[in-house]
């Protein structure tokens, strides 16, 4: 018979412990940090030495209008690796290249100046596996 590991809740996340391994389970419903933005929010969860972000933006959201002024920038300079969960958005570069990000797509955006905005009338939600620590902070 397999022993059931001890389970307890600590500061909004669950910890499972056995004699060989500790597993930490967290949810975005109880993030470690929330960055409230005009027309959106960026939730951060820190886990296993990494920070994962969840971006949720309303229709009409645009980085240069709703994030840029609060961080003192006209374009985002953060490198991103992520996954689009729902909705559509663009990544637009100053040289005229524009890429659409759609639900189910993994994306990489290099750390060169770019703008982004929600496309259509549905909210946009994505996970960010790289760049979350620096997103929507001064000098991003």
Predicted regions and their residues:
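Short, charged/polar surface micro-motifs in flexible loops or helix N-caps
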Residues: 50, 58-64, 88-89, 132
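Ligand-binding loop in jelly-roll beta-barrel domains
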Residues: 110-136
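Short acidic-glycine-tyrosine-enriched beta hairpin
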Residues: 95-112
């Amino acid at each position: 018979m397999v022993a059931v590991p001890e389970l307890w809740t600590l500061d909004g996340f669950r910890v499972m412990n056995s004699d060989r391994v500790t597993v930490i389970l967290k949810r975005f419903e109880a993030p470690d940090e929330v960055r409230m933005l005009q027309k959106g929010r960026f939730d951060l969860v820190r886990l296993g030495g990494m920070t994962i972000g969840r971006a949720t933006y309303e229709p009409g959201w645009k980085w240069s209008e709703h994030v840029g002024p609060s961080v003192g920038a006209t374009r985002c300079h953060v490198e991103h690796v992520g996954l689009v969960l729902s909705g559509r958005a663009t990544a637009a570069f100053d040289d005229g290249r524009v890429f659409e990000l759609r639900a189910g797509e993994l994306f990489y955006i290099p750390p060169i100046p770019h703008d982004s905005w929600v496309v259509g009338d549905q909210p946009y939600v994505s996970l960010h596996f790289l760049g979350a620590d620096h997103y929507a902070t001064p000098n991003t």
